[in-house]
């Protein structure tokens, strides 16, 4: 006899039939059908509690104060590490050239140079922000900033 997909079945004793609840005392799962007496878990759709619900007690997210916010300018600004500028050709750099060099993601609306590592080439940065340390390093190599 060959084995076919439509002939497959579990081995004997490997599976048992579904327990039918609420079918009399003798079954062991009669009357309350294994749900106990009253309460939300005894009801249909019971046990589906909203996240954060604490049984009527004021929930934690309402007890704690509202603080802070997430600045959109941080989300829209891409940080460019200063040593990565050395991979570019010396000269003028603007936001578009940083995007072409894939130093800035497409979601960013502006860029900021952050000091990290060393810089050897001279750059003129147009319309790009920088930290104080990065500005000092770029100006020390002979570079400049234009707004």
From Swiss-Prot:
Residues 16-63 are annotated as: Disordered. GO terms for molecular function: rRNA binding; structural constituent of ribosome. InterPro entries: Ribosomal_uL15, Ribosomal_uL15/eL18, Ribosomal_uL15/eL18_sf, Ribosomal_uL15_bac-type. Keywords: Ribonucleoprotein, Ribosomal protein, RNA-binding, rRNA-binding. GO terms for biological process: translation. It holds the Pfam family Ribosomal_L27A. Residues 23-33 have a biased composition (Gly residues). Residues 34-47 have a biased composition (Basic residues). GO terms for cellular component: cytosolic large ribosomal subunit. Part of the 50S ribosomal subunit. Belongs to the universal ribosomal protein uL15 family. This is Large ribosomal subunit protein uL15. The gene is rplO.
């Amino acid at each position: 006899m060959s084995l076919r997909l439509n002939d497959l079945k579990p081995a004997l004793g490997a599976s048992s039939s579904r327990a039918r609840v609420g079918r009399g005392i003798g079954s062991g799962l009669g009357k309350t059908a294994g749900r106990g007496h009253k309460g939300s878990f005894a009801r249909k759709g019971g046990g589906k509690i909203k996240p954060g619900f604490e049984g009527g007690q004021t929930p934690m997210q309402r007890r704690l104060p509202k603080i802070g916010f997430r600045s959109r300018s941080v989300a829209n600004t891409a940080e460019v590490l200063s040593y990565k500028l050395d991979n570019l050709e010396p000269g003028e750099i603007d936001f578009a050239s940083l995007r072409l060099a894939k130093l800035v993601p497409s979601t960013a609306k502006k860029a900021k140079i952050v000091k990290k590592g060393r810089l050897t080439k001279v750059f003129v940065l147009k319309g790009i922000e920088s930290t104080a340390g990065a500005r000092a390093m770029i100006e020390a190599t002979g570079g400049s900033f234009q707004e």
